[in-house]
């Protein structure tokens, strides 16, 4: 079992949990500190998992839920505003990998009048976006067959934690889909505050390991935001990174090890418990029909 970041086979058990009735083991690389599931052990490493099983396990059916639509609708303006600060000119073409219902693409389209394309393996979610007139594909390979050219922005929001090889996937995006002066935007759960441990989360990222993965995929970080939007005003549940292609991707920086990961997670979760107890309505912003106690 090799680490997807540094390739080391030295690891220790980081945590044992259960998710949707499945026992999960998370390992930590002893060399670089990355926290991950074994691809050999995880059912979520199978691509068919997302086409046929993922939504059914998580929400009992395959169709978009009110929670999905609400969270995506609240998240999209934040991401559009963040990316807008780094565009030299309005983006003409935008690709969203893991586009779900297409709400983020719809927001980009309305803001910049951009041509938008989405990748979504879930049939019902892809159909939902297509009904709004968004051009959608099941996989990047299907899009590549259409020879779409290059995009000014490629986003992957809550995607790379699900990928068996995030570095290879990001590298493929850089080489085949992103323009030379284009931007990459990724968002992942923050291991130091978010629950993170889920059947479908093959990798759990810290701010450090997210940046290292981007570096090894040939990207240069522009900004890394720790935030809770749209679920919390007090807890930095998410990490959002904007990056651009490195000037010379063949010369990758050396990998720096992440230290004291377990301790930082314990401190972060302790803060989370206090925030939830003392300021429940700020710690968690309610979803439609949800009451915060």
Region spans (language model):
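Conserved beta-strand edge residues that scaffold enzyme active sites
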Residues: 122-123, 143, 191-192, 227-229
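Conserved S-adenosyl-L-methionine
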Residues: 11-18, 219-229
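Short, glycine-/aromatic-enriched active-site segment of Class I SAM-dependent methyltransferases
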Residues: 184-215
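Short catalytic micro-motifs in class I SAM-dependent methyltransferases
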Residues: 157-162, 187
């Amino acid at each position: 079992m090799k680490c997807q970041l540094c390739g080391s086979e030295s690891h220790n058990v980081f945590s044992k949990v259960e998710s949707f009735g499945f026992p999960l083991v998370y390992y930590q690389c002893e060399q670089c500190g990355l926290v991950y599931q074994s691809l050999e052990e995880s059912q979520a490493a199978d691509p068919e998992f997302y086409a046929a099983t993922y939504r059914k396990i998580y929400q009992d059916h395959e169709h978009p839920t009110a929670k999905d639509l609400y969270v995506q609708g609240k998240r999209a303006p934040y991401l559009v505003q963040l990316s807008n600060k780094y565009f030299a000119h309005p983006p003409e073409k935008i690709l969203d990998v893991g586009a779900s219902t297409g709400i983020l693409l719809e927001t980009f389209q309305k803001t910049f009048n951009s041509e938008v394309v989405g990748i979504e393996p879930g049939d019902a979610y892809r159909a939902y976006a297509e009904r709004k007139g968004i051009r959608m594909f099941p996989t990047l390979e299907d899009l590549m067959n259409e020879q779409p050219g290059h995009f000014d922005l490629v986003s992957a929001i809550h995607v790379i934690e699900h990928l068996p090889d995030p570095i290879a996937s990001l590298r493929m995006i850089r080489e085949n889909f992103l323009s030379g002066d284009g931007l990459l935007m990724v968002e992942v759960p923050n291991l130091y505050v978010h629950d993170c441990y889920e059947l479908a989360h093959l990798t759990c990222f810290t701010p450090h390991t997210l940046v290292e993965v981007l570096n090894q995929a040939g990207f240069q970080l522009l900004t890394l935001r720790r935030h809770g939007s749209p679920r919390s005003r007090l807890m930095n549940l998410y990490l959002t990174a904007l990056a651009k292609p490195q000037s010379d991707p063949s010369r990758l920086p050396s990998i720096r090890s992440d230290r004291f990961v377990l301790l930082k997670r314990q401190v972060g979760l302790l803060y989370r418990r206090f925030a939830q107890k003392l300021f429940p309505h700020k710690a968690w912003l309610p979803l439609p029909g949800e009451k915060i106690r």
